[in-house]
Amino acid sequence: MKRRSFLIQSALALPSLDLIAKSLFVDPWTIKMLNKTTGIFSERGGTILFKFTKNGIVVIDSQFPDQADHLISELKKQNEKPFELLINTHHHGDHTGGNIKFKGLVNRVLAHTNSKANQMRVATANKTEANQLFPNQTFDSVWSEKIGKDRITLHYYGAGHTNGDSIIHLEKDNIIHMGDLMFNRRHPNVDRSS
């Protein structure tokens, strides 16, 4: 290869190397604040909703263990309060797999009664009980509590995506988290095994 040709080709390739290098060091997750105290975390699987309150941090869903580590690390950078409550919208692993990373960090894990039973059934069948943090608080129809300045209410309207889906309403923010009852740009899925 002639020197002139080499220099031209190298000069043309240089900008693409910069893009490749930047893409290798970009965090694989995103955090988007919806307002001053409420945001969403996305990486792999479902969307995690979090709320900073004067009492502590409320987290809805936990994705998988690696993603939960990223979430916990990022939330600790933004807020010094402890984790107050972890809510699971339903039992699937992309919503509860990261629960184990909250062990020792959060005192309360909340889900619908059927969701807890389903999570326990699947973990027992797969022999993964040691990798789980199961809900220690459940509800059947409606659960509501004022946490900080916001009231958080969970509703169960019957079987949908699973037989244990919760709809979570952050009343002051007027934000609803529906887990996998609502999909973006695709048809919903019904898990007939639950």
Spell out what each predicted region is.
Residues 3-23:
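N-terminal export signals
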Residues 29-73, 166-170, 174-180:
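Conserved beta-strand hairpin/beta-sheet module of binuclear metal-dependent hydrolase folds
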Residues 30-38, 123-127, 148-153:
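Short Pro/Gly-enriched beta-strand edge/turn motifs at strand-loop
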Residues 33, 42, 102-103, 130-132, ...:
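Extracellular/periplasmic catalytic domains that process cell-envelope and extracellular macromolecules
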Residues 56-57, 64-65, 144, 151, ...:
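Metallo-beta-lactamase
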Residues 61-68, 92-95, 132, 194:
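Solvent-exposed, acidic/flexible segments
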Residues 67, 91-97, 116-119, 162-164, ...:
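Active-site environment of divalent metal-dependent phosphoester hydrolases
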Residues 76-144:
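Active-site HxH/HxHxD metal-binding segment of metal-dependent hydrolases
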